[in-house]
Amino acid sequence: MANNYFQFKQFLIHQRYCAMKVTTDACLFGAWVAERVGDCKRVLDIGAGTGLLTLMVAQKTNDAQIDAVEIDSEAAKEAATNFKASPWNERVDLIRENIIKYKVGDLYDFIITNPPFFNNDLKSDSNKRNLAMHSEALSLDELLVSIERLLKAGGLFAILLPTHRSVEFEGKALLAGFYLREKVLVKQTPKHPPFRSMLLFGHEQVIVTESELVIKENDSYTADFIALLKDYYLYL
């Protein structure tokens, strides 16, 4: 059973009611994204869940305004609680809304998303977990339409996907006018196949940077893993 909370160095994530708990791959993605947000002033987190990604980015930015959109009522309440208790409460906002219907005046410089996974896999008995884990509620096509509508010209977006779905998404993104800039394949160990892909897209075509990130080797965290998460994890 997952813990009801996850303590980071500078913030706490309550996760009693949110269907999707803090995971290692989500933490890696949050840290990786936070290094790429840079001086962006307006950031959007689509499908915020507990607010993990929002707070990881907030920790690494000085004055970025981060809006977190979440459709599930219990997850939204928990994210709002996590935001209020954080050191960055004044510049992180929780918006309970369907991203398809979400409207905003000023477009975003950077969009991050850890969308529903496993649309073809066996569903669980929990409706909330199904909503979080399956893509019937928000398809990749609908996600891309929302990103295209909300991202300003010259902006970037980053997405975490199961590796077996990344090629499909890259094709869809290209048709929507987005070019892949970076791709990181995440592996549990050197002997395991990649299970997650961290992808960065923009409007301009560039030479794609591709790499691998291994979480553990010889039962210890790798140097790459530690470098990304040492500012977040308590015991690194």
Region spans (language model):
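SAM-dependent Rossmann-like transferase core, predominantly class I methyltransferases
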Residues: 2-42, 48-59, 214
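A generic structural signal for alpha->beta connector loops
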Residues: 10, 63-65, 89-91, 154, ...
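General small-molecule cofactor/ligand-binding pocket signal
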Residues: 14, 67, 93-95, 181-184
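Conserved Class I SAM-dependent methyltransferase catalytic core
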Residues: 18, 22, 138-194
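Residue-level signal for inorganic ion chemistry
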Residues: 29, 114, 143, 201
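Conserved SAM/SAH cofactor-binding pocket of Class I
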Residues: 31-105, 110-113, 119-124
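Mobile active-site "lid"/loop adjacent to the S-adenosyl-L-methionine
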Residues: 115-142
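SAM/dcSAM-binding transferase cores
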Residues: 191-236
